[in-house]
C-alpha cells in the first residue's frame, strides 16, 4: 500500500525557527557599492575558533554550519569529543563535515599573500614585546629603588650586632652619672658575694677612643670603650661620632642583581673629586636596552635618597658626623651612640623626591682614557658599549651635576 502524495509533502514541510520567522531578508548588493569593515571584526569572522588563526582549508559542519580549519576539526574529532567545539552539537564523524572552497576563495581575495600577512603579524608581535620589555625595565628600576631605600632605612634604625655588648660594658651611654652599670660594674659589685670562679674575660686594651665612649662609666667604661673601638672599626664607627675607627670605604661595590647584561662602574667626574664634592664610585648591573636617561634619573634618585637618609640619621647636625655624598647610612652621628647630633641646631627640612629628573646629572665617557665625551640621553647602554668602549671589561662612566638643567 502506497502513501498518498499529499502526506509525503506534509512530512517534508520546512519548519521555521523563531529566529528565521523574525529575520528580515536582506537584498543582495549587485552594484559596485563598497562597505567599510573594521580589521577586528573581519579577523573574528575569518578566525578558526580552535587555533585562533586564519582559516586554512576551511571545513563546515553540515548541521550548525560552523567553520574550522580542516586539521583542527579532524584532530578534535579524533580526540574523542564527537561534538562541535562552538555549539556542542553532535558530530558523528568526518562525514558530518564538508569542505567550503567558496570561503577559502573569499579569504584569498581579501589576503592575496598569506605569507606577507603572517610576516606582518610577526613584526607586530616583536614590536609589542619590545615595548613591554621597556616598561618592565622602568618598573623594575623603580621597584629596586624602593626596596633599596626601605632596606637602607631599616639598617639605619636597627643597631649593629656588637653595639649592645659594648654599650653595656661601658656602663650605659644614656645614663653617664649612674653607678650601677650592666656589664663589668655589676660583675665587680657582686664578685665578693658570689662563689669564686674563673676570672671574667677582660677585653683587649683600649686606645684613645676609650675616653670618647665611656663618658661616665669610670675605668671599666674606658676599657669597654676601647674594646668597642676595635670591634666596630670595620663598621665605620657607628657607636660614637666618628673617632672610633676609620669609616668603611665609600666605593665598596654592592653585589649586582642577577639577570643583568652590562656591568657599569659609575665614578664622579675628576673635577668633582678634586673639589671634594663627590667621592663615591657606584657599581651597577642592568640590561643593555637601558638608556643614558635611565641612568641619570637613577643617579639623581639615589643621591637624593642618600642625602635624605643622612639627615634622618642626624649626620649633618652632630659634631662628629660626616656629611659627604658617599657617607651612606653608616657615618657617625656624634656623641651619644650616633643617633642624633646632641643639642645642635634644628635640622633642615628633608629634600623632596618629587622634583628629581634625569636632567640633573650629565653622563660622560672617556674612551681610551682620553677626553671626556658627553653621552646623549637617548643612547642605549648596548650602543654606548659598542660605539665608545669596545673592551672586555665593565663599562666605565663618569657623572657630574648639570650646570643649567632644563
UniProtKB/Swiss-Prot annotation:
The modification Phosphothreonine is found at residues 24, 215. GO terms for biological process: anterior/posterior pattern specification; camera-type eye morphogenesis; chromatin remodeling; negative regulation of DNA-templated transcription; protein ubiquitination. It is an enzyme of class 2 (transferase). It is found in: Nucleus speckle. Gene3D superfamilies: Phosphatidylinositol 3-kinase Catalytic Subunit, Chain A, domain 1 (3.10.20.90), Zinc/RING finger domain, C3HC4 (zinc finger) (3.30.40.10). It catalyses: S-ubiquitinyl-[E2 ubiquitin-conjugating enzyme]-L-cysteine + [acceptor protein]-L-lysine = [E2 ubiquitin-conjugating enzyme]-L-cysteine + N(6)-ubiquitinyl-[acceptor protein]-L-lysine. One of its GO terms (cellular component) is PcG protein complex. Its EC number is 2.3.2.27. Residues 151-263, 309-354 are annotated as: Disordered. A zinc finger (RING-type) spans 48-88. Residues 30-234 are annotated as: Necessary for transcriptional repression. Residues 230-406 are annotated as: Necessary for interaction with CBX2. It comes from the Eukaryota. Residues 246-258 have a biased composition (Pro residues). The keyword Zinc-finger applies. Constitutes one of the E3 ubiquitin-protein ligases that mediate monoubiquitination of 'Lys-119' of histone H2A, thereby playing a central role in histone code and gene regulation. H2A 'Lys-119' ubiquitination gives a specific tag for epigenetic transcriptional repression and participates in X chromosome inactivation of female mammals. Essential component of a Polycomb group (PcG) multiprotein PRC1-like complex, a complex class required to maintain the transcriptionally repressive state of many genes, including Hox genes, throughout development. PANTHER family: E3 UBIQUITIN-PROTEIN LIGASE RING1, E3 UBIQUITIN-PROTEIN LIGASE RING1 / RING 2 FAMILY MEMBER. This is E3 ubiquitin-protein ligase RING1. It comes from Canis lupus familiaris. The lineage of its organism: Eukaryota, Metazoa, Chordata, Craniata, Vertebrata. The gene is RING1.
Amino acid at each position: 500500500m502506497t502513501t498518498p502524495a499529499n502526506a509525503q509533502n506534509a512530512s517534508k514541510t520546512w519548519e521555521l525557527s523563531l529566529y528565521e520567522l523574525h529575520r528580515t531578508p536582506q537584498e543582495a548588493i549587485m552594484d559596485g557599492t563598497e562597505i567599510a569593515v573594521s580589521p577586528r571584526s573581519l579577523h573574528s569572522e575569518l578566525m578558526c575558533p580552535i587555533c585562533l588563526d586564519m582559516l586554512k582549508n576551511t571545513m563546515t559542519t553540515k548541521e550548525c554550519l560552523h567553520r574550522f580549519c580542516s586539521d583542527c576539526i579532524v584532530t578534535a574529532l579524533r580526540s574523542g569529543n564527537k561534538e562541535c567545539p562552538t555549539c556542542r552539537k553532535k558530530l558523528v564523524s568526518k562525514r558530518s563535515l564538508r569542505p567550503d572552497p567558496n570561503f577559502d576563495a573569499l579569504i584569498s581575495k581579501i589576503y592575496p599573500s598569506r605569507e606577507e600577512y603572517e610576516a606582518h603579524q610577526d613584526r607586530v608581535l616583536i614590536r609589542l614585546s619590545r615595548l613591554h620589555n621597556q616598561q618592565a625595565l622602568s618598573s623594575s628600576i623603580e621597584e629596586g629603588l624602593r626596596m633599596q631605600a626601605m632596606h637602607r632605612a631599616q639598617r639605619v634604625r636597627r643597631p649593629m650586632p656588637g653595639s649592645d655588648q659594648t654599650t653595656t660594658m661601658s656602663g650605659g651611654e644614656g645614663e653617664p652619672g649612674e653607678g650601677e652599670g650592666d656589664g663589668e660594674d655589676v660583675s665587680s659589685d657582686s664578685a665578693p658575694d658570689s662563689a669564686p670562679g674563673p676570672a671574667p674575660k677582660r677585653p683587649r686594651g683600649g686606645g684613645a677612643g676609650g675616653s670618647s665612649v665611656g663618658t661616665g662609666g669610670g675605668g671599666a667604661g674606658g676599657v669597654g670603650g676601647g674594646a668597642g673601638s676595635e670591634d666596630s672599626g670595620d663598621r665605620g664607627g657607628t657607636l660614637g661620632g666618628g673617632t672610633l675607627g676609620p669609616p668603611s670605604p665609600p666605593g665598596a661595590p654592592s653585589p649586582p642583581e642577577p639577570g643583568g647584561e652590562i656591568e657599569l662602574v659609575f665614578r664622579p667626574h675628576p673635577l668633582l673629586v678634586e673639589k671634594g664634592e663627590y667621592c663615591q664610585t657606584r657599581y651597577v648591573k642592568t640590561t643593555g636596552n637601558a638608556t643614558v636617561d635611565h641612568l641619570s634619573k637613577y643617579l639623581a634618585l639615589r643621591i637624593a635618597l642618600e642625602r635624605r637618609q643622612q639627615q634622618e640619621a642626624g649626620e649633618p647636625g652632630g659634631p662628629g658626623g660626616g656629611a659627604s655624598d658617599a657617607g651612606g647610612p653608616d657615618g657617625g652621628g656624634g656623641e651619644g651612640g650616633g643617633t642624633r647630633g646632641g643639642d645642635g641646631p634644628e635640622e633642615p627640612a628633608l629634600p623632596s623626591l618629587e622634583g628629581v629628573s634625569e636632567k640633573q646629572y650629565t653622563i660622560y665617557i672617556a674612551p681610551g682614557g682620553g677626553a671626556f665625551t658627553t653621552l646623549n640621553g637617548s643612547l642605549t647602554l648596548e650602543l654606548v658599549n659598542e660605539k665608545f668602549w669596545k673592551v672586555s671589561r665593565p663599562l666605565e662612566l663618569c657623572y657630574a651635576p648639570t650646570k643649567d638643567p632644563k
